[in-house]
C-alpha cells in the first residue's frame, strides 16, 4: 500500500478539517463547565481511566481463562494495545488522538467474566428480557452504573465519545430504521431517547480507527498468546500466506533467533503492515470523499478507515486459523463449557435469592422491581464480575465448581 507521508500528521497538533473538534463538541447530557487545562475529549479519556470498570478489565479474560502464566493478555492489556494502535492511526490521519484513544479505552467495558463465553451465557439467560450485548452494556456502565459523581449517574461523557462507543463498528439501523445486525439492544434505544446518538449513520473517523485497531490488536496478539500456550505452532502459521511471507522475511534477516524473539519479530511486522494498510486505504477514501467536516464522514455510506481487499482477505484467513486451532480447540471448549455453567448457575441463584449478591447496593435496590427489571439488574451485577470473583462466588454458593484450568 502506497502512503503519502506528506499527508501524515506526526503529533504537530494540526487537525484535518474532517477531524472531530473538542472545542465544538455536541456536549454532555448533563452540562458542565469546561476545563482550563484539558480539552473535552481529554477529560473523557481521563474519566474512563479512573473508573472501576477500567480497573476490573485487569482480571477479565481475553481468550485464555485462568491461564497458568502471567504473560497472557487480559481485557486490560488488550485495551491498552488497542488504544496505542488507535492513537497511532489518529495521529497519522490528523484526527483527534484523545477521542480515538478514549473510544478504544472504553470499547470493552461491557464484557463479562470469561470473555465471549460469559457474554454468550448471559445473553442466553437474559434472552426473555431482551438479551445481552457487550456494547450496550458498555453504554449502561458509562451512563448509569458507574457511581462517581454527586450530580448524576455514569461519568457524563461527551456525545462524540458515546457515539463512538455505540457505533464504532458501523450504523445500527438502515434507512427504514430496521436493525442491520438484528434488533438494536434496548439499552441503546433507551439512551437515545435522552440523547440521540444517530444510530443510522457512521461514527466519526476517530471511532472508526478505534474499531480497526481492535481488529489489528486481537488478531495479532491472539496469535502471540496461542504460540505461548502451545495451541499454535510456527508450522500452522504457514497456512496464511501473509504470515508465511513475514516468517520468511524474519528468517532471512535473522537466521539464528530464539523462538520468543522470532515470534515477536513476526508480530511487530504484522502490526506495522496492517496499520500502514489502513492508513493507505483511509487516505484513498478521503481523497475520493473530500470531506470538509466530521459530519461529512458520518454522512458517507461506507467505512473510511478499513482494510484493503487484500488485507481483508488476510484478516479472514487469520480468523479462520484462530478459530480452527484456538477458539475451537477441545481444551478451550471444555473450559468454555465450565464457564457457561458458572454464569448460568449464578444468574438463576441470584434471581431466586437476591440476598446472595454480596453488596448492599445490589441487594437493596432490587426491591420492588418487575421480573424483567430484576433480570437486568442481576445481569448488570454478573457482567461486572471479574473471572476470579465469579469463580469464588460459585464456589461459595455451589457444591461443585467446574475446573477452568
Curated annotation (Swiss-Prot):
Top-level taxon of the source organism: Bacteria
Single GO BP term: dGTP catabolic process
InterPro entries cross-referenced by the UniProt entry: dGTPase (IPR006261), dGTPase-like (IPR050135), dNTPase_2 (IPR023023), HD/PDEase_dom (IPR003607), HD_domain (IPR006674), PHydrolase_assoc_dom (IPR026875)
Disulfide bonds: none
Keyword annotations of the record: Hydrolase
A Pfam short name: HD
GO molecular-function terms, A-Z: dGTPase activity
Residue intervals of the HD domain: 75-219
HAMAP family reported in the protein's UniProt record: dGTPase_type2
Record protein name field: Deoxyguanosinetriphosphate triphosphohydrolase-like protein
